[in-house]
Amino acid sequence: MNDVSQKAEILLSSSKPVPKSYVPKLGKGDVKDKFEAMQRAREERNQRRSRDEKQRRKEQYIREREWNRRKQEIKDMLASDEEEEPSKVEKAYVPKLTGTVKGKFDEMEKHRQEEQRKRTEEERKRRIEQDLLEKRKMQRELAKRAEQEGDDSLLITVVPAKSYRAAANRKDPEDLDREHRNGRVSQEEEKTRHEEECRALKEAKCLSLVMDDETEAKKESRFPGKLKSTFEELERQRQENRKKQAEEEARRRLEEERRAFEEARRNMVNEEDESQDTETVFKEYRPGKLRLSFEEIERQRREEEKRKAEEEARRRMEEEKKAFAEARRSMVLDDDSPEIYKAVSQESLTPGKLEINFEQLLRQKMEEERRRTEEERRQKLEMEKQEFEQLRQEMGKEEEENESFGLSREYEELIKLKRSGSIQAKNLKSKFEKIGQLSEKEVQKKIEEERAKRRAIDLEIKEREAENFHEDDDVDVKPAKKSESPFTHKVNMKARFEQMAKARQEEEQRRIEEQKLLRMQFEQKEIDAALQKKREDDEEEEGSIVNGSTTEDEEQTRSGAPWFKKPLRNTSVVDSEPVRFTVKVTGEPKPEVTWWFEGELLQDGEDYQYIERGETYCLYLPETFPEDGGEYMCKAVNSKGSAASTCILTIEMDDY
């Protein structure tokens, strides 16, 4: 009985179907034991299957985790060599790699996935068939149990021939167990071999990727790649670069102008110091015979006036800078509240205060004009210094020659005149008269003033020359007429100095007149603009009173719809200067205010800054460009209605 029960248990635990012809005959007392044995075998089989399934899932989880780790390492290796990884993976044409390790790995990976899919499909079908067989087996066992407990006539009769045939076809349970174990061992070997192949292929792929990266670092890849950025991104980057370049150019130009102004101011101070030093040197080392007191006094007076004017202008400029800094500091202190400042670079808003840029424009123009005049003045002063040095050297040489040789030549001519007679004397006299008439009329007055001083000097020279040559008393009469010959040359040089001084004075006067005219024109423009603005405000107020706008305002305030107490106005600004659009809007509930440019909504940011303080709303542009010119609109919306106000911004180019 034990052998029969063991064989029945083995048959029941096996997965092969049991032929119906073989029914072992057991006693009625062993049916319960048989059922319990079947139940235990079924539970053990289920437990063994669940353990195998858990083990298989655990191994699969470990394999997948290892594969994901290796794949992440490969991705990290690839990402470390690339400069930038595109955030969005776009579909692109990737050529098929054949004849390389990558291509072989891809083919083997596809083949492995196909085999895995086939194995899973076969395993699923096998499990379904096994479940069906187990259900049929359970039904047969229940039927046998019912037959044994109930009617014996329902038992299946055993045919010897069929039983022999079935016994011949039936395999031994030990053979079945051996085959089952061999199949499981072969499956494990196949699984380990497959894992080793995958590991080898992964290592080969990593090596190939590293080698490919090294070769790509040395030479460009021959396979086409995808674009790293689209055309829109390139265009956006180009526009941003252009805008940054324009900002840097404006900043650089401003810095250069500031440095040039500082350099010019330092040079002007240095030149003033040098001019003072040169004046002291000239006063100390000037020759006694070239002392032109009138010209020197006049030049000193003009230089003193010029220095005073420059010091006054510099002092006024410093006062304006201090006043501007104090005003700006007070504005920052007044408007320093977290409601207004949405950014650190945002300027303060003072309600009721109108910013006018023509003060800054006037200051810039005055600085440009001052720099230009100072540069011209320095150049002319240098030229005059050079001419003065050259003339002084020439005059010194001529004076020395005249002092040493002039009188000797005169006395020789006088001796010749005594010998030649009165005709040559008359010709020489007419010659000197013509030379005297060649002097200009404007210089005659100053010549007469200097004649007394020169005459005394000439008399002393004549006396010394008379003593040297030991001439007769007749010589003391005629050299008096000849003594004016060197004086004519001095008169011409003096006239030349006078002409130069007069030309400089006229040029300075003309420049002062031009500056006055420009200042008057600019002030007149400011006055006209202020009067025009006041006239427009008066007309708007009168029109609002005449048209009954006060009642409309009262109706609008009662209705709660937004309306503009102070609408936008057309304005113009110089290129790269800041601009602010200010409106006053009221409404109940509080309206939401947005700003628009050429039909496009402007977002609050660094380029376009929204400022809000009570009913006053502002749009502030820290810096303007030529493309910022156009139509701007302020739109206010609440639940009761909406309102809008528009204006035109004009960008003027800075030509100076």
Curated annotation (Swiss-Prot):
Keywords in alphabetical order: Actin-binding, Cell junction, Cytoplasm, Cytoskeleton, Immunoglobulin domain, Phosphoprotein
SUPFAM superfamilies in UniProt: Immunoglobulin
Composition skew (Low complexity), residue ranges: 11-26
Ig-like domain boundaries: 562-650
Expression by tissue: Expressed in brain, testis, spleen and fibroblasts (at protein level). Not detected in liver, kidney or epithelial cells (at protein level).
A GO molecular-function annotation: structural constituent of muscle
Record-listed Phosphoserine modification sites: S80, S221, S330, S337, S345, S544, S549
GO biological process, one term: dendrite self-avoidance
Coiled coil (UniProt feature): none
Composition bias type Basic and acidic residues, residue spans: 27-78, 103-131, 169-198, 216-269
Ranges for region Disordered: 1-131, 165-198, 215-284, 468-492, 529-564
InterPro entries for the chain: Ig-like_dom, Ig-like_dom_sf, Ig-like_fold, Ig_I-set, Ig_sub
Cellular compartment(s): Cytoplasm, Cytoskeleton; Cell junction, Adherens junction; Cytoplasm, Myofibril, Sarcomere, Z line
Subunit structure and binding partners: Interacts with F-actin.
Function: Involved in regulating cell migration through association with the actin cytoskeleton. Has an essential role in the maintenance of Z line and sarcomere integrity.
Name this polypeptide is given: Nexilin
